[in-house]
Amino acid sequence: MEQPESWFAADYAEARAKFRAAAERAGAALAAYRNPDARQPDGGDLTTDVARLGPAPDRAAKVLIVSSGTHGVEGFCGSGCQIGMLE
């Protein structure tokens, strides 16, 4: 088991990469949705990454949605918690 400190990132790109890698290791289906109206401070794309575990939502009896980063700054903490759940 990884140490919890390894779940957290110092910036958006690192948080995104860690989340996507953890989702892939967990066997999740991944999708990314680019925000056409916003950019990172360095000009890079801002995206919402979606990791789905289990059956497609239209075939699942119950669905749990967990999100972070809706307002920006809390994304690093939320992403770390999500990575911990995936690990």
What would you call each of these model-derived segments?
Residues 1-87:
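Structured catalytic-domain cores with a bias toward divalent-metal coordination
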